[in-house]
Amino acid sequence: MRPVLRSLPLLLALALAGCGQPASSASDFKGEKKDVADTIEQLQSSAQSRKPEDICSEVLARGLVEKLKSAGHDCVDEMEKVTGDADDFELDVTAVTISGATATARVKARKGGKDGVLTSYTLAREDGKWRLTSLGS
């Protein structure tokens, strides 16, 4: 199994975790950095609303969707598998770096009251919007 697919359930369970809707971490940023953080917020919102099709069409970059497809997986099916666990997590964007048409968002995930995993998500500008090009690392 390819590395991106092997870690898919864990990474997406954290990424798609949704949250109990605390204050948005995107509000901590301005300009392009806020736009990047908003993409992470959109990931949470779509997961919490159980809308895997929105994640595939609005949040993930086309290249990532194609990578899933070329490995024999349907994006919507894969997102459906992990959005069932979207209630007990909180994602907090702690830092954003932008370099031209690419960006990295540092995200802290917490489950319940426990501090959790720090991970980085890479994004790229696609059709004027920031889209995830990775599922975290």
Predicted regions and their residues:
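Bacterial N-terminal signal peptides that target proteins for export
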Residues: 1-9
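C-terminal motif of bacterial Sec signal peptides marking the signal peptidase cleavage site
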Residues: 15-18
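Surface-exposed, charged secondary-structure patches
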Residues: 20, 68, 73-120, 137
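Hydrophobic pocket/interface hotspot
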Residues: 43, 55, 123
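Short, well-ordered alpha-helical segments enriched in acidic and aromatic residues
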Residues: 49-67
